[in-house]
Amino acid sequence: ILMVGEIRDEETVSLAINAALTGHLVLSTLHTNSAAGAIPRLIDMGAEPFLISSTLNVIVAQRLVRRLAEEKEKYTLSDKEVANLSSHCSVERVTDILRNQKLLKLKQSLQDVSFWRPKATKENPDGYKGRMGIYEVLPITETIKSLIIQRSSADAIQERAQQEGMRTMVEDGFVKAAQGITSIEEVLRVVTE
């Protein structure tokens, strides 16, 4: 197992790919806005798409969100708030994911889900305490490999990965917001920065 602190340049990309080609498990970090964005970034740094597709197993993207403190305020989304959310994510996908997670019943809509807001206290003036990750896990399947070889855009790779079941960071954040771990506002703040 080889850990590369961060891949920033062509030389580091080349070393990581060569190590992976010789059978080493290589773990590294890379600065991108999404899991799918890592692939064009590697290509921009000089990695050949056929080498990326044969050496990459999975990409995990993460952002840290603040955790709600124990004192929090319960609320439900208005129709207007749901309409505003559609500019950040697919409301239908979020609804389906919440149903799969048993956070929403079959006949219910997103407006029926209880979400939580921060509540200021003496101990936690902003209503938050600690942090946790929201994640996007992109497995490199055969169809994703062929998109890599075709030099497809991050958007095309993301779209295909979502069709194959990948949950985006926003969607993962919504699950955690519905569980009362963080707030929708915090999720949107972090993913739109």
Question: Language model features by range: what are they?
Answer:
Residues 1-193:
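Short, flexible helix-loop junctions that flank or precede catalytic/ligand sites
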